[in-house]
A protein has these predicted regions:
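Conserved double-stranded beta-helix
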Residues: 2-4, 12, 25, 183-225, ...
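Non-heme Fe(II)-dependent double-stranded beta-helix
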Residues: 2-47, 52-151
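Conserved hydrophobic/aromatic beta-strand scaffold that supports enzyme active sites
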Residues: 49-51, 139, 159-163, 176, ...
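Short, solvent-exposed loop/turn segments at secondary-structure junctions
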Residues: 57-58, 128-131, 145, 167-169, ...
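Short helix-to-loop capping/linker segments positioned immediately adjacent to catalytic or ligand/cofactor-binding
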Residues: 112, 146-151, 161-165, 211-214, ...
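Short, conserved beta-strand element in jelly-roll/cupin
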Residues: 116, 150-169, 217-220, 225, ...
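Active-site region of the double-stranded beta-helix
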Residues: 119, 133, 146-154, 163-173, ...
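A short secondary-structure junction signal
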Residues: 136-143, 150-151, 170-176, 185-189, ...
Length: 303
């Protein structure tokens, strides 16, 4: 896999707000120097993704895992090929525990999301994905396919993948097609279609290996940042161990989120969350006044 140091530098000055860009450099400094942050931004913009290793400590990972294991024990496995019939997916994570606010508004995630999407970006989805032994690959897909603008197009979303376990070629590391945001979507063989959402067991998500694919291997505690228009898929788990990630996904402030966050997280729970997380849920305004409630700022609902 290419490293951040291989990437071309990217202008750290976000077009929307140079002052905010400087704040990002300071915010990510515990993990990335200004130069490495610049190169990571270049990675995401140009080839579509960047991996930053060993961001979270073991005690943080264990806390998330304990919460998720409790809820997975009470939930069914995936309903179709896309979700994975040998996978557990949990949605609406902020409704399950406020601890996930720390992950959702982590300085690294915010720096990339705000750089590419602007400060009015929203949380589009936040789910955990636990691949059990024997899980097969997903169909190729993008995370912004619901926005029906032909590829190639600009960056409408940023997807973040937090590795709670070591992810490797054997246990289902996410497979990515670098630079595929530049392609015409019709070039992708084995891409997602409506049949993959059917609750049937006669469909197989497996397709032949794509020679252009890269497997995003990384140790536990690492994070991958990816453009939402990059073609990718969950890998197959050929081991006897689970592989778990949590993926918060962000969209531009004008876009409809994949999960209806204002319904997924009840107002009484949202009211106790940090302000930045509330804004990401939709208790915020996209310039000049998109998102108002009865002519007023939506955050008033929580007061």
């Amino acid at each position: 896999m290419l490293t951040i140091d291989d990437a071309k530098p990217h202008d750290l000055t976000a077009a929307y707000n140079a002052e905010l860009a400087a704040e990002h450099v300071e915010a990510v400094s515990p993990w990335l120097s200004a130069e490495r942050f610049s190169r990571a931004l270049g990675d995401v913009h140009d080839r579509g993704y960047a991996v930053i290793e060993s961001v979270m400590a073991k005690d943080e990972l264990d806390a998330y895992r304990d919460i998720l294991n409790t809820h997975m024990a009470q939930s069914p496995t995936g309903r179709n090929v896309f979700e994975g019939t040998k996978s557990h997916r949990l949605y609406a994570l902020l409704a399950k525990s406020p601890l996930f606010a720390n992950m959702i508004q982590h300085p690294l995630a915010m720096a990339f999301a705000e750089h590419f999407l602007g400060p009015t970006c929203l949380l589009s989805a936040c789910l955990s994905i636990n691949l059990h032994p024997g899980e097969t690959v997903q169909p190729w897909h993008t995370d912004d396919g619901h926005i029906t603008v032909p590829q190639p197009h600009g960056i409408f979303g940023i997807s973040v993948f937090w590795a709670l376990d070591d992810t490797n070629e054997a246990n289902g590391a996410t497979e990515i097609l670098p630079y595929s945001h530049r392609w015409d979507s019709h070039e992708i063989e084995g891409r997602l279609d409506n049949a993959h959402f059917a609750q049937r067991d006669d469909l197989d998500g497996s397709v032949e290996e794509n020679a252009a694919a890269v497997k995003a291997t990384m140790p536990a505690g690492s994070v991958m940042i990816m453009r939402s228009d990059v073609w990718h898929r969950g890998g197959a788990n050929h081991t006897d161990q689970d592989r778990m990630i949590v993926t918060p996904q962000y969209c531009a402030g004008w876009a409809r989120p994949l999960e209806s966050m204002l319904l997924a997280v009840p107002p009484e729970k949202a009211a106790s969350l940090p302000q930045r997380t509330q804004e990401l849920l939709g208790y915020s305004i996209h310039t000049p006044f998109m998102g108002y409630v009865d002519g007023m700022h939506p955050s008033r609902v929580l007061q």
